[in-house]
Amino acid sequence: MSSENQTFESASEMDAEKEERRRRGLLLLLLLLLLLICCVGFLFVRYLIKPQPLPELVPVINQVNYPPTYAYSIYGVDKPVGVAVSPDSSRIYVSETGGERLIKIFNRDGQLLGSFTTPGTSIGERSPVYIAVAADGRVFVTDRMQDAILIYDADGNYIDSILGPEMTLSKYLNKHMGGLVPEGTTFYYNNMKGVVYLTQPGEIEQALPAPDLAEWDPLGVRFDKDGNLLVTVVTDQSVRIFPAGTLRSDSLVAFSGQANAFGSYGQEAEQFLFPNVAVVDSQGRVHVSDGNNGRVSMWDAQGKFILYYGRGTGDEALNLPRGAWMDEKNRLHVADAVGHTIRVYDVSGDEPVFLYKFGDLGDTDGLFYYPNDICIDNAGYLFIVDRENNRIQVWTY
């Protein structure tokens, strides 16, 4: 057989093989199409028989979990410890433990808009820590030196103080003066001096005796979606929940106090050692960053203990959990101060699942040195207190 015939036969065989592969490919495609039609038909028939939401065939892209990315930093703060954002995200509030121990207000570009502080106190008499902003824009700040939760308007003008589980400063004054507190009266309380200062319109400042209060030392504050205020208390190592109705501006003078409290001192499952922040997930469960126990504990809406997590080894293990924030996807973000990182858990199911961490020890962009608090706005921007680097880092999803 000549070489030309051999070449011709080889080419014919190759063409036949290509045709066979093409035929098989078309057949496989038809089978897949038929299978897809059968699946769609089955789902359609099932829906006709029993109408209900159909299962999702393709995962939605915004349900995929991935770490945020670093955006920028806000400077001009001295040893910051707490951060919060206004409801419209236009203002960032930061508490300082260094310098003058102020609460500073920044815009989103990091420009300083103003500052305020615990009224009637010197530097050594105040120590603002955690901050929470109500839906109406009022700012709630815990002060460790004053053993109180101070309430301000959005511009930092003082309104009132929560002095205990069932007492506000305005309630105390109302009782002390027989309900005859004139409109326009200003007042404040200095716990270190044990004096209430009162100035009525047209009169000079008066000093009144301090209220007789049970010891309490509020630390962490967070609002849930219904406007209830969750407070961690170091005195008895507990979490206390104040109903939204008692916190309205017109209700503070008749403050009715907390509706629920749980927790005690210790290292057992249902106990706390320096609880920092309590937040609520979409199922109403409360998650508490239990600082010195190195874990987060989960409780039901009635204050019954469920479980704890964040212990052990690996990336999911917490060292010193401080501030925490629950986003709309039920992702709990925990500032691990000693771990110099933010750890994130999916708490949408019965048991929390560790997702990822971000950040590490350092002083350059995206690195932390003792992160102490975190909050997230409605646009998915994360504001993280980077205490020893004297800045607020801003990240974004």
Residue ranges and their predicted role:
Residues 54-78, 206:
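A short helix->beta-strand "capping" segment at the edge of beta-propeller domains
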Residues 69-74, 112-122, 160-162, 204-211, ...:
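A short beta-strand motif characteristic of beta-propeller blades
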Residues 75-87, 121-135, 167-183, 211-224, ...:
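Beta-rich, blade/repeat-based domains predominating
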Residues 91-93, 138-140, 187-188, 228-230, ...:
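Conserved beta-propeller blade signature
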Residues 97-98, 144, 192, 234-235, ...:
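Short loop/turn segments immediately following the C-termini of beta-strands
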Residues 107-111, 153-157, 200, 243-247, ...:
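Short loop/turn segments that connect beta-strands within beta-propeller blades
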Residues 369-397:
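Blade-level signature of beta-propeller repeat domains, shared across WD40, Kelch, NHL, RCC1
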